[in-house]
C-alpha cells in the first residue's frame, strides 16, 4: 500500500455562497498543500453559473442526488432548517460514495451545516474538520450560546440585554441571530445542534485572519476564553474567496466600468439568495437616483416574504429580460448616463477589484464582505438574515470600514439611502473608510503569503502535517506494524 499524499473528502451544503468557499478551500489544499481533494456537492436545478463554476475548479467533483424533502419541512420553515434536512438526508448517499472509493479519504471536511456527516469520519477511520466559511465571531457565538443557562439566554432574547461573549465585543440584541429569538422553532434547535457539534470534530477551520477579527480570534485561540468551549484546534485560514479572473471574464458591465473614473462607482448586490421587498426595491432605486452617483446594480425580483426565501434555489446566474419592471417607471432611462442595471447576476469578484469601483452596498454575507476587503472597497451595510447583522456590526463599529442602515427591517427611506451613498462616495468619512479597508487588504495579502509564512498558510500547513501523520499511522497499521 503506497500512498504519498493525504486525501480530503469535502461536503458542501447547497447554495453558491456555501459551495464557492468549500471549492476554494479544496483548491488551496490541492495546490499548496499536496492534497488529493474530492468535493461532494448536491445536484441542483440551478443550471448555468453553478455548473460552469464546478466544471472549472480543478478538483474532483462528485455530485450527490439532492434529497426530496417534500413532506419533511413546511414551506414556511427557515432556510437553515431546510438546508439541515437536505444535508441530513444526503448522508446515506455520501456514505455510499465514500465506501466505494479506491483510496479512502484521510480527512472529512464538512461545512457549517454538514455536521450530521461527522459520524462518517469514525465509521471510515478519518480525521474530521468543520469548515466555517463565515467568521470567528459567528463561530464564537455558535459554540458559546448553546452552553448558557436559560436565565442568561433570556436576559439577551427577552430583556434585550447585550450578550457578553468571553474576550469579544458583546452582541447587541438587534444583531443577534434570528434563530435565537424563536426557541420553540426548529431553526433554533438546528443552530444549537450544529454549535454543539463543531467542537466534536478534530479541528475547526474558520475563514478569517488576525487583523480582520483580532478580539474574536484571540479569544478562540485562548484556552481560558472561547478556546475553553471550542476544545479543539481552531485554524484561521482566511481570506478564502473566489480568485479574480478578469482576463477570462466576458461581461458588458466590465466594459462599462472601463469607461468610468477611478473609485467613482457604487456596486449594489444582495448576494445569490438575498431579496428585497417591492417597497425596499423602489426606495433603493429612488435613493440611488437622488444621490447622482455612478452605480452598478445587480437586481433580483422583489419578494414579500422572507428576505432569504430565494437562498436555497438561487443559482447565481441567468438573465430576466423583464427586470426593469421591478424598478420605478423611467428609472433606467433617467440614470442611463451614470448607471448600469444587471439582471440577476454579475461577476462580483471582478467588479469589486476594478479600479472604478469605490463603494459596495451589500447584505454583508461573509463571502461578499471578504471580496470587498480584498478589493479595498468600503461598504454600506444592509444586512438581511443569518449572521449578517453581526457582520455589519463588525464592519461598522469595530473596523470602521462600513456605514450601516439603522434598522433594515424597518421602513427604508430613499433619503437615508441617498445620504449613505453620498457619505461613502463623496465625503471625508468615505475617504477614511477607504484608507482603513486598503490597510486590511494588505493584511489579507500577508495572511495568504506562502513565502512570508502568513497565518492562513501556516494554519493549513498544520492541518496538512496532522493529516500526513494520521495517514502514516494508517499505512503502518495496514502493513501490520
Curated annotation (Swiss-Prot):
User: What is known about the tissue distribution of this protein?
Assistant: Expressed in seedlings and roots.
Q: Which residues bind an anthocyanidin?
A: 18, 386
Gene3D superfamilies recorded for this chain? Glycogen Phosphorylase B (3.40.50.2000)
User: What EC number(s) is this enzyme filed under?
Assistant: 2.4.1.111, 2.4.1.126
Keywords assigned by UniProt, alphabetized: Glycosyltransferase, Transferase
Q: Which Pfam families does the UniProt entry name for this protein?
A: UDPGT
Q: Which residues does UDP-alpha-D-glucose bind?
A: 346, 348, 363, 366, 368, 371, 387-388
Q: Which PROSITE patterns has this protein been placed in?
A: UDPGT
Q: Origin, by domain of life?
A: Eukaryota
Q: Which reaction does it catalyse?
A: (E)-4-coumarate + UDP-alpha-D-glucose = 4-O-(beta-D-glucosyl)-trans-4-coumarate + UDP + H(+); (E)-coniferol + UDP-alpha-D-glucose = 4-O-(beta-D-glucosyl)-(E)-coniferol + UDP + H(+); (E)-sinapyl alcohol + UDP-alpha-D-glucose = 4-O-(beta-D-glucosyl)-trans-4-sinapoyl alcohol + UDP + H(+); (E)-sinapate + UDP-alpha-D-glucose = 4-O-(beta-D-glucosyl)-trans-sinapate + UDP + H(+)
SUPFAM superfamilies xrefs: UDP-Glycosyltransferase/glycogen phosphorylase
Q: List the disulfide bonds.
A: none
The cross-references to InterPro entries, in alphabetical order and at most eight, read: UDP_glucos_trans (IPR002213), UDP_glycos_trans_CS (IPR035595)
What is this enzyme's class at the first EC digit? transferase
Q: Which residues form the active site?
A: 18, 111
Q: From its record, what is one biological process in GO terms?
A: lignin metabolic process
Q: Which GO terms describe its molecular function?
A: coniferyl-alcohol glucosyltransferase activity; hydroxycinnamate 4-beta-glucosyltransferase activity
UniProt miscellaneous comment: Plants overexpressing UGT72E2 show increased accumulation of monolignol glucosides in roots and appearance of these glucosides in leaves.
Its family?
Belongs to the UDP-glycosyltransferase family.
What task does this protein carry out? Involved in the O-glucosylation of monolignols (alcohol monomers of lignin). Glucosylates coniferyl alcohol to form coniferyl alcohol 4-O-glucoside. Glucosylates sinapyl alcohol to form sinapyl alcohol 4-O-glucoside. Glucosylates coniferyl aldehyde to form coniferyl aldehyde 4-O-glucoside. Glucosylates sinapyl aldehyde to form sinapyl aldehyde 4-O-glucoside. Possesses low activity with sinapate and ferulate as substrates.
Q: What is this protein called?
A: UDP-glycosyltransferase 72E2
UniProt organism field: Arabidopsis thaliana
Q: Which gene encodes it?
A: UGT72E2
Amino acid at each position: 500500500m503506497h500512498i504519498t499524499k493525504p486525501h480530503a473528502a469535502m461536503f458542501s451544503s447547497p447554495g453558491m455562497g456555501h459551495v464557492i468557499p468549500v471549492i476554494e478551500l479544496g483548491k488551496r489544499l490541492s495546490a499548496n498543500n499536496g492534497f488529493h481533494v474530492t468535493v461532494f456537492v448536491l445536484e441542483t436545478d440551478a443550471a448555468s453559473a453553478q455548473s460552469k463554476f464546478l466544471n472549472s475548479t480543478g478538483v474532483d467533483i462528485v455530485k450527490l442526488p439532492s434529497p426530496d424533502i417534500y413532506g419533511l419541512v413546511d414551506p414556511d420553515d427557515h432556510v437553515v432548517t431546510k438546508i439541515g434536512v437536505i444535508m441530513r438526508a444526503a448522508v446515506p448517499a455520501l456514505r455510499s460514495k465514500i465506501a466505494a472509493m479506491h483510496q479512502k479519504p484521510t480527512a472529512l471536511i464538512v461545512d457549517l451545516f454538514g455536521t450530521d456527516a461527522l459520524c462518517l469520519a469514525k465509521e471510515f477511520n478519518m480525521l474530521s474538520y468543520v469548515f466555517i466559511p463565515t467568521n470567528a465571531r459567528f463561530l464564537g457565538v455558535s459554540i458559546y450560546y448553546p452552553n448558557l443557562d436559560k436565565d442568561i439566554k433570556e436576559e439577551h432574547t427577552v430583556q434585550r440585554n447585550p450578550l457578553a461573549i468571553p474576550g469579544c465585543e458583546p452582541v447587541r440584541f438587534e444583531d443577534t441571530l434570528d434563530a435565537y429569538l424563536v426557541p420553540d422553532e426548529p431553526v433554533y434547535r438546528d443552530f444549537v445542534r450544529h454549535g454543539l457539534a463543531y467542537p466534536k470534530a478534530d479541528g475547526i477551520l474558520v475563514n478569517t485572519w488576525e487583523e480582520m477579527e483580532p478580539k474574536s480570534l484571540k479569544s478562540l485561540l485562548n484556552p481560558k476564553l472561547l478556546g475553553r468551549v471550542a476544545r479543539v484546534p481552531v485554524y484561521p485560514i482566511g481570506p478564502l474567496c473566489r480568485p479574480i479572473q478578469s482576463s477570462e471574464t466576458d461581461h458588458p458591465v466590465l466594459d462599462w466600468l472601463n469607461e468610468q473614473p477611478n473609485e467613482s462607482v457604487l456596486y449594489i448586490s444582495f448576494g445569490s439568495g438575498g431579496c428585497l421587498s417591492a417597497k425596499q426595491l423602489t426606495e433603493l432605486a429612488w435613493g440611488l437616483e437622488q444621490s447622482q452617483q455612478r452605480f452598478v446594480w445587480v437586481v433580483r425580483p422583489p419578494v414579500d416574504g422572507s428576505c432569504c426565501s430565494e437562498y436555497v434555489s438561487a443559482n447565481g446566474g441567468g438573465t430576466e429580460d423583464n427586470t426593469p419592471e421591478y424598478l420605478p417607471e423611467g428609472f433606467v432611462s433617467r440614470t442611463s448616463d451614470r448607471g448600469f442595471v444587471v439582471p440577476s447576476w454579475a461577476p462580483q469578484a471582478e467588479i469589486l477589484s476594478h479600479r472604478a469601483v469605490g463603494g459596495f452596498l451589500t447584505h454583508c454575507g461573509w463571502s461578499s464582505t471578504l471580496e470587498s476587503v480584498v478589493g479595498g472597497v468600503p461598504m454600506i451595510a444592509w444586512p438581511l438574515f443569518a449572521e449578517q447583522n453581526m457582520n455589519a456590526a463588525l464592519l461598522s463599529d469595530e473596523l470602521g470600514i462600513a456605514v450601516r442602515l439603522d434598522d433594515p427591517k424597518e421602513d427604508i427611506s430613499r433619503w437615508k439611502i441617498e445620504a449613505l451613498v453620498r457619505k461613502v462616495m463623496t465625503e471625508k468619512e468615505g475617504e477614511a473608510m477607504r484608507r482603513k479597508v486598503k490597510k486590511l487588504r494588505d493584511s489579507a495579502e500577508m495572511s495568504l503569503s506562502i513565502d512570508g509564512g502568513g497565518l492562513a498558510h501556516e494554519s493549513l500547513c498544520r492541518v496538512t502535517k496532522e493529516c500526513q501523520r494520521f495517514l502514516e499511522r494508517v499505512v503502518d497499521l495496514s502493513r501490520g506494524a
